[in-house]
């Protein structure tokens, strides 16, 4: 009887021990997803905080860079557009001044014959009033008239009368046009072909240097024009010729190296 009670108690103890182990494993299994979820949420919060910090830094950098650009330029885009509009107005004002110049003591005579001299111009305009000076525009290379000149009268009224009376007059077979000068200051010689008469006559060496420089510039310009207008056929022929020349030079070098290569010594066996 006592042995049966002992066996029953052992079975009950083993059963209870199995139940406890099952509960412990179940509790650990249920607690692991919650811990994983909590760690994932903590990592998400960390990422969000890092993103907010990066975003704030990026916004601060953008604002500072925009501020630096504005401080360097000193103006925003509307002011730039205002500046461009002001430039267009200035161009329009200059165009109007060129088309309708103001009355001045200096008048320009255009369309003259290149053979018309300064003395001939003075004889034509001297009858309208005293002339301060006459400036003939001379070509620096040919030393001939460019076909127009500027006349400076002492009085504004005399210049106005000469302009109205001489516009359309025929001088040396050419019909001239007379108009007020745009600039009020004296006309200075300009660089290039359109220049005034030099202050001292050019020597022989300076003229030869001038002509040689001009011929060199012309030949360079002609060479650039010819090189820019090469047809595809000519370019292909040039490529073929250069390639053929390169192949021939390589073959010559190879044959020369072969002929210069050292020969192997021939052994002669003695019969004795």
From Swiss-Prot:
- Cite the entry's keywords alphabetically: Developmental protein, Differentiation, Phosphoprotein, RNA-binding, Sexual differentiation, Spermatogenesis
Could you tell me which species this protein originates from? Drosophila virilis
> Could you say which protein family the record assigns here?
Belongs to the splicing factor SR family.
**GO MF annotations, alphabetized:** RNA binding
Q: Is RNA-binding there in the keyword field?
A: yes
Residue ranges annotated as compositionally biased, kind Low complexity, are: 26-41
- Domain notes from UniProt: The RS2 (Arg/Ser-rich domain 2) and RNP-CS (ribonucleoprotein consensus sequence) domains are required for both male sterility and female-specific dsx splicing but the RS1 domain is dispensable.
Question: What residue spans carry the region label Linker?
Answer: 184-204
- This chain's protein is named Transformer-2 sex-determining protein
What does the record list as GO biological process? cell differentiation; sex differentiation; spermatogenesis
Q: Which domain of life is it from?
A: Eukaryota
The free-text function statement in the UniProt record for this protein reads: Required for female sex determination in somatic cells and for spermatogenesis in male germ cells. Positive regulator of female-specific splicing and/or polyadenylation of doublesex (dsx) pre-mRNA. Splicing requires an enhancer complex, dsxRE (dsx repeat element: which contains six copies of a 13-nucleotide repeat and a purine-rich enhancer (PRE)). DsxRE is formed through cooperative interactions between tra, tra2 and the sr proteins, and these interactions require both the repeat sequences and PRE. PRE is required for specific binding of tra2 to the dsxRE.
> Record's Pfam families?
RRM_1
Biased-composition ranges, Basic and acidic residues, are 87-102, 205-218
């Amino acid at each position: 009887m006592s042995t049966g009670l002992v066996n029953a108690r052992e079975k009950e103890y083993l059963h209870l021990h199995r139940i406890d182990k099952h509960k412990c494993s179940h509790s650990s299994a249920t607690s692991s997803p919650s811990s994983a979820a909590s760690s994932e949420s903590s990592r998400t919060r960390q990422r969000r905080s890092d993103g907010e910090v990066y975003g704030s830094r990026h916004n601060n950098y953008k604002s500072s860079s925009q501020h630096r650009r504005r401080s360097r330029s000193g103006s925003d885009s509307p002011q730039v557009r205002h500046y461009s509009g002001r430039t267009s107005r200035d161009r329009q004002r200059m165009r109007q001044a060129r088309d309708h110049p103001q009355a001045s003591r200096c008048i320009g005579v255009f369309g003259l014959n290149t053979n018309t001299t300064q003395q001939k111009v003075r004889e034509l305009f001297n009858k309208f009033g005293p002339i301060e000076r006459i400036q003939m525009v001379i070509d620096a290379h040919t030393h001939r008239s460019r076909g127009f000149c500027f006349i400076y009268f002492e009085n504004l009224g005399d210049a106005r009368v000469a302009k109205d009376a001489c516009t359309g007059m025929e001088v040396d077979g050419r019909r001239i046009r007379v108009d007020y000068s745009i600039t009020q200051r004296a006309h200075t010689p300009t660089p290039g072909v359109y220049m005034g008469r030099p202050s001292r006559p050019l020597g022989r060496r300076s003229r030869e240097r001038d002509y040689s420089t001009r011929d060199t510039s012309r030949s360079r310009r002609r060479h650039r024009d010819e090189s820019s207008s090469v047809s595809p056929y000519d370019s292909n022929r040039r490529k073929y010729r250069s390639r053929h020349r390169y192949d021939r030079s390589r073959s010559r070098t190879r044959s020369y190296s072969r002929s210069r290569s050292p020969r192997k010594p021939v052994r002669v066996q003695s019969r004795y």
